[in-house]
A protein has these predicted regions:
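ATP-dependent carboxylate-amine ligase catalytic core
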Residues: 2-14, 18, 24-121, 129-152, ...
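Short hydrophobic alpha-helical runs that function as membrane-insertion/retention elements
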Residues: 125-128, 183-185
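Internal gly/pro-rich beta-alpha loop/helix module
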Residues: 136-210
């Protein structure tokens, strides 16, 4: 497998599902075999993952399953082999793992959280942050997430809902000062705003099966 990473955010509503879906679609269009995963028992976002990756999204849950089982699931659906389903026999090129809620939100403090999955699988984290109402205050937010659990690895930050080129420049300076790579700045766009229903986003108008 060429690449595997986890997409997380400080809170729900930061844009991680929309970003994850976009990256999955991009990698798939480029000809990569993309294996999607969802942290926790979420049954809505996995449907959206499958729509763009053309293969089932697998749930990873350290509350419902042991750490050993989570590692085995990840291995089976990324590395392939005879013990994998027919559609997963060939190794994946890219694995994208997404989580609902915030990075450290679990059933008991951080246990069962996205951070727990990142720790168990030793995956680098891309942090998606809603930057619509902050500039230099982002330094404190980024420091807090990076320093809170030193065992985690952060590949970088993607700022969402950025207001202007000047705002983006300020946010890039913040990332450089904190010591984390700025992987991108997504401008605030009405077209990217998704409604929500039940436990997840509502993409019904964009899917063919609804």
């Amino acid at each position: 497998m060429k690449s595997a990473f986890l997409i997380a955010a400080p809170t729900s509503g930061s844009g991680k599902t929309t970003l994850a879906r976009g990256l999955m679609a991009l990698f798939t269009q480029q000809g990569h075999r993309v294996q999607p995963f969802k942290c926790g028992p979420d049954y809505i976002d996995t449907k959206f993952h499958e729509a763009v990756c053309h293969r089932p999204s697998i749930n990873l849950d350290t509350f419902m399953a042991s750490e050993e089982h989570v590692r085995e699931l990840f291995r089976r659906y990324t590395q392939g082999g005879d013990d994998a389903p027919a559609w997963a026999r060939e190794p994946a090129d890219v694995a994208v793992v997404e989580r609902m809620m915030g990075l450290f939100d679990g059933y008991d403090r951080y246990h069962g959280s996205c951070a727990d999955i990142a720790r168990v699988l030793d995956l680098p984290i891309i942090l998606v942050v809603d930057a619509s109402s902050a500039a230099y205050s982002m330094a404190a937010i980024l420091h807090g997430f990076i320093d809170f659990f030193p065992d985690l690895r952060f590949s970088g930050v993607i700022y969402n809902k950025v207001g202007s080129p000047r705002h983006a420049a300020m946010l890039r300076e913040v990332a450089a000062e904190v010591g984390i790579a700025c992987l991108g700045c997504i401008p605030k766009q009405a077209a990217l705003i998704q409604g929500s229903r039940y436990l997840g986003l509502d993409f019904s108008e964009h899917t063919q099966d609804e």
